[in-house]
């Protein structure tokens, strides 16, 4: 009788110790910290053979007298012309007289993309048609493959919008986003049209 109870007890201990390694139970454990219950340590007992940045100290040769190579110190002029005028046009639409739009000052962006409202406001079709209207002749002459891929993409998107997204385009037209006389200098979200000036 004692041997049976002892073997049963050892089997229970063995199964519980094995279950301790795997946490697959659907019953939530009672822990003192919620993050601790979700933290799974999958690298226990693993020795990292590479340098962990921020964890391990920097590799140094012991008793080495050569100083660590560092870039030469540069004296930076905090009041240089470039630093002093940084961000001067950020609020020109609020503080200016309204004659200059902030999109016209985005010199780091391509000309055809300045002030474009983005993929969440304007769709890809409008952007590609605008690009094609500006660079159609140059693309056809210099890179015919890119020109062909652009035409294919526009054709596919036109089919998609004509058959699948008619309600969306109709809603945009009803919002008044499509003006008869669009502004060609920049693509503002309030002035969008398929008709664009060809340079």
From Swiss-Prot:
Transit peptide: 1-15
Record flagged with keyword Electron transport: no
Cellular component terms (Gene Ontology): mitochondrial large ribosomal subunit; mitochondrial ribosome
Pfam families named among the record's database cross-references: MRP-L51 (PF10244)
Entry's Gene Ontology molecular function annotations: structural constituent of ribosome
Keywords associated with the record: Mitochondrion, Ribonucleoprotein, Ribosomal protein, Transit peptide
Example GO BP: translation
Localisation: Mitochondrion
Cross-referenced PANTHER family: LARGE RIBOSOMAL SUBUNIT PROTEIN ML51, MITOCHONDRIAL 39S RIBOSOMAL PROTEIN L51
Family (UniProt): Belongs to the mitochondrion-specific ribosomal protein mL51 family.
Subunit organization: Component of the mitochondrial ribosome large subunit (39S) which comprises a 16S rRNA and about 50 distinct proteins.
Protein's name according to its UniProt entry: Large ribosomal subunit protein mL51
UniProt source species: Caenorhabditis elegans
Gene it is expressed from: mrpl-51
């Amino acid at each position: 009788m004692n041997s049976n109870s002892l073997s049963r007890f050892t089997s229970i201990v063995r199964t519980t110790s094995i279950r301790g390694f795997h946490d697959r139970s659907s019953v939530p454990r009672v822990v003192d910290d919620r993050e601790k219950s979700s933290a799974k340590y999958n690298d226990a007992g693993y020795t990292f053979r590479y340098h962990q940045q921020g964890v391990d100290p920097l590799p140094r040769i012991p008793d080495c007298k050569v100083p660590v190579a560092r870039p030469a110190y540069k004296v930076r002029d905090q009041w240089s012309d470039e630093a002093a005028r940084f961000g001067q046009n950020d609020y020109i639409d609020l503080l200016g007289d309204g004659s200059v739009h902030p999109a016209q000052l985005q010199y780091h962006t391509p000309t055809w993309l300045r002030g474009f409202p983005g993929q969440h406001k304007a769709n890809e079709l409008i952007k590609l048609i605008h690009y094609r209207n500006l660079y159609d002749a140059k693309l056809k002459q210099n890179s015919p493959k890119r020109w062909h891929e652009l035409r294919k993409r526009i054709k596919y998107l036109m089919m998609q919008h004509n058959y699948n997204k008619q309600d969306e385009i109709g809603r945009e037209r009803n919002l008044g986003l499509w003006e008869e006389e669009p502004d060609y200098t920049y693509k503002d979200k309030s002035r969008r049209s398929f008709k664009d000036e060809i340079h």
